């Protein structure tokens, strides 16, 4: 017996992509943005199909992602930002609400939302995850978005 498998690919994921980007910790976030753009273009997405929307920080990303999803113009949203732990509970609130809000947007509107918001304990970890030792999480989020766009199309075609 053969099990039927439906999955997305990276090659059949043409579409329009919104990158919702938090400006806070921009020294890290800009590397995430570049990684995402490079990955999308390398997989055949035209730069004219990309829109970058900048917000103050990670906490504001879900609201803007919601507005973007509501408009129905984009096949996927890529959320990019960086929340670095400090000495107060602020980190937990921002990271948790950003994560929860983005999941809610995806479920509410049926639009893939790729999570490329770093939630790290130190600046060193942020730097590692934005293009050095631990890869580029912006590029990984872009790959996730590509795959999800393709998967959603496959599911709708069935």
Swiss-Prot record:
Q: Name one GO biological process term.
A: riboflavin biosynthetic process
Highest taxon of source: Bacteria
Indicate the residues that form the catalytic site.
90
Name the pathway.
Cofactor biosynthesis; riboflavin biosynthesis; riboflavin from 2-hydroxy-3-oxobutyl phosphate and 5-amino-6-(D-ribitylamino)uracil: step 1/2
Question: Where along this sequence does the record place binding of 5-amino-6-(D-ribitylamino)uracil?
Answer: 24, 58-60, 82-84, 115
**What GO cellular component entries does it have?**
cytosol; riboflavin synthase complex
Q: Does the keyword Transferase apply?
A: yes
Q: Which EC number(s) are documented for this chain?
A: 2.5.1.78
Q: Which UniProt keywords apply?
A: Riboflavin biosynthesis, Transferase
Catalytic reaction annotation: (2S)-2-hydroxy-3-oxobutyl phosphate + 5-amino-6-(D-ribitylamino)uracil = 6,7-dimethyl-8-(1-D-ribityl)lumazine + phosphate + 2 H2O + H(+)
- Report the coiled-coil segments: none
Q: Where does (2S)-2-hydroxy-3-oxobutyl phosphate bind?
A: 87-88, 129
Protein family membership: Belongs to the DMRL synthase family.
> What does this protein do, in the record's words?
Catalyzes the formation of 6,7-dimethyl-8-ribityllumazine by condensation of 5-amino-6-(D-ribitylamino)uracil with 3,4-dihydroxy-2-butanone 4-phosphate. This is the penultimate step in the biosynthesis of riboflavin.
- State the name under which the record lists this protein: 6,7-dimethyl-8-ribityllumazine synthase
Origin species: Azotobacter vinelandii (strain DJ / ATCC BAA-1303)
Coding gene? Answer: ribH
């Amino acid at each position: 017996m053969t099990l039927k498998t439906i999955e997305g690919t990276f090659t059949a994921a043409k579409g329009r992509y919104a990158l919702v980007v938090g400006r806070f910790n921009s020294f890290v976030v800009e590397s995430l943005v570049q990684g995402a753009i490079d990955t999308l273009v390398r997989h055949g997405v035209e730069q004219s199909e990309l829109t970058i929307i900048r917000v103050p920080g990670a906490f504001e990303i879900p609201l803007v992602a919601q507005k973007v999803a509501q408009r129905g113009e984009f096949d996927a949203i890529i959320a990019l930002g960086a929340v670095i732990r400090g000495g107060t509970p602020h980190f937990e609130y921002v990271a948790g609400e950003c994560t929860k809000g983005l999941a809610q947007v995806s479920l509410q509107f049926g639009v893939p939302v790729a999570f490329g918001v770093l939630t790290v304990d130190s600046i060193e970890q942020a730097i590692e995850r934005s293009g050095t030792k631990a890869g580029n999480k912006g590029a990984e989020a872009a790959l996730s978005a590509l795959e999800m766009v393709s998967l959603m199309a496959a599911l709708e075609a069935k």
